[in-house]
Each structure stands twice: as C-alpha cells, then as structure tokens.
C-alpha cells in the first residue's frame, strides 16, 4: 500500500459522515511521505519544535504548537507519543511512530475524540509494523 493510500483511506476516511480537515504522514526529518491536498505548507522549524516536545515534553506548552503558521494551544497529550492542540472549534493531533509523524487536523463537527481515534489507530498500526 502506498503512503498516499494510508492518508486517503485511513486518515481522510468518513466517520459518521465527517472527516479530518487535513492529514499527513511526515518523516521525522520533516520530509513529506504523503499528505492530503488540504494540508498546510509548513516550515521545518515547526516540525523541529514538535519533535523537541516529544523528546522534552512540555516545551510547546508556553508558546503553542505552530503548523503552517497556525497556532494551536497545546492540551493534554501522552508524553513522548501524542501531542494534542486546540484552536477554536478544531484542533490538531500529532502521533509519533518509530520513523514518522502522523498529523491530523480537524474542525467541527468532527470531535477531538474522533480525530484522536483516526490518527492514533494508524500510528499504532505503523508502530506494530516497525515504522
């Protein structure tokens, strides 16, 4: 299966008639493995800051998580595994695997719980596969 199929079929899937606003699978070097057409253009510094928070949990809390110039308030996540951010009625979930970052961006009516499920399910699968 191609990386694009993982994005199209597993991240941008329908959940009760709703779907993520944007999604991507990135290498931990910031390279794009695959992304939805709606995924924002980002700076490598933004990815570096996300990776730093995985290594040193809490570093993004004071400044917020930035992706594509959009600022998300960092909320409860799982240290070293998942970062969650909120902005208005939407937010972002970043799941770290052995080699990649799985990123999902959502807005209402999709709920934070639905976004968590979508992103973390794929991330857990990739971890099981050694990726």
From Swiss-Prot:
Q: Which cysteines are joined by disulfide bonds?
A: none
User: Pfam families annotated for this entry?
Assistant: Profilin
SUPFAM superfamilies tied to this protein? Profilin (actin-binding protein)
Supply the alphabetized keyword list.
Answer: Actin-binding, Allergen, Cytoplasm, Cytoskeleton
InterPro entries hit by this protein: PFN, PFN_euk, PFN_sf, Profilin_CS
Q: Which GO terms describe its molecular function?
A: actin binding
Q: Where in the cell is it found?
A: Cytoplasm, Cytoskeleton
CC per GO annotation: cytoplasm; cytoskeleton
Q: According to its UniProt record, which protein family does this protein belong to?
A: Belongs to the profilin family.
Q: How does it assemble?
A: Occurs in many kinds of cells as a complex with monomeric actin in a 1:1 ratio.
Q: What is the purpose of this protein?
A: Binds to actin and affects the structure of the cytoskeleton. At high concentrations, profilin prevents the polymerization of actin, whereas it enhances it at low concentrations. By binding to PIP2, it inhibits the formation of IP3 and DG.
Descriptive protein name:
Profilin
């Amino acid at each position: 299966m191609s990386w694009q199929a993982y994005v199209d079929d597993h991240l941008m899937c329908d959940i009760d008639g709703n779907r993520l606003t944007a999604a991507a699978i990135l290498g931990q070097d910031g390279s794009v493995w695959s992304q939805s057409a709606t995924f924002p253009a980002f700076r490598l510094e933004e990815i570096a800051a996300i990776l730093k928070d995985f290594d040193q949990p809490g570093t993004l809390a004071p400044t917020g998580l930035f992706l594509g110039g959009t600022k998300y308030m960092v909320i409860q996540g799982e240290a070293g595994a998942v970062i969650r951010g909120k902005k208005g009625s939407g937010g972002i979930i970043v799941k770290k695997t052995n080699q990649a970052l799985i990123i999902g961006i959502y807005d209402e009516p999709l709920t934070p719980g639905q976004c968590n499920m979508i992103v973390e399910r794929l991330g857990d699968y990739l971890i099981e596969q050694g990726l």
